[in-house]
Amino acid sequence: MRRTNLIASALLACFFSTIPAFSQTVENPAPVGADVTKKMPFAMVGQAIFRSGQSWYEGSGTVVQSKSVLTAAHNVWDPVNGWSTNVQFNRARSGAAIATRTFASRLYVFGSYRTVAARYGPESSRAFASDLGGLRFNVAPAGGAYAGWRADTRTLTAGAPVLCLGYGAEFHSGRELLAVRSASGFIPVVGAFLESTALTFEGGMSGGPVLSEVAPDDFRVVGIVVAGSATPPAGGIRALDAAGAAFLATYLRY
C-alpha cells in the first residue's frame, strides 16, 4: 500500500461520499466511533505519523508489548529515503482527542524486507510478504497495557470472521479509527501475504491490526494491513506466521 501523504489525504477526504449499504458488494472501512476507540483492544491501536525524505506520512500500529508497537515495515523504511524519522504514535486517537502521544526511540523491520523491497519494489507481493515493522519506546504508550497476538494463519484462511483496523486517511480524515470486517477469509498470494477481494483498505491503515476473536471477548492480533486497492477492490494483509512470531519475540518483546 502506498504511503499516505498527510496533505494529499486531507484533500482526498473532501471528495468522499458514502454509498448506501444495500448497493455494496464489497466491504469498505468505516469509523468505529469514539466510545469503541476507548475500549480494549481497540484502545491499543494508534495513528503513526512519520517523516520520510522531505514529506510527512501516516500509518497505523498496535501496542503488542509494554513498550513495543507492531506496524508495517514500509512505514519505517523506504528503499529511496531509508529509515523514517520523527516517528510519532498517537494511541487511541479520535478526532482531536489522543489517549497518549509517544515518539519511537528505535525502529525495526523484518529481516528480508529491505532486500526484497529494494529489489522488487515496496508495492510488490514479495515485499508485502515481508512487510512487518516495529517501534520501540522509552515510555510505555499504554501504561504497560497491550494487545495479545497469535501466529495462526488458519484463522485467516478458514473463513472465520476477522476485524481489520487502522487510521484510514485516503477517503477519511486519518483522525478516526476505521474498521472493516472480513467474513469470507483471505487467499494466500505469496508466503505470508494474503488477499481478499471482498473488502478494501484505505491508505493510512497500513500497519493496523487484523483481529480474530479466538475466544468470547478475547481478540488477538493475527496479522496486519499492508495493501489495498479500490479498483479493482482488494485488501492485502501480512499474516503472523512462525517467522512473524519470531520477529515479535525477538524485537518487540519489551
Predicted regions and their residues:
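Chymotrypsin/trypsin-fold serine protease catalytic domain
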Residues: 128-201, 235
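Catalytic histidine site
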Residues: 43-91, 184-190, 229, 235-241
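Conserved catalytic-core segment of clan PA serine endopeptidases
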Residues: 25-43, 50-56, 77, 81-142
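Bacterial N-terminal signal peptides that target proteins for export
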Residues: 1-8
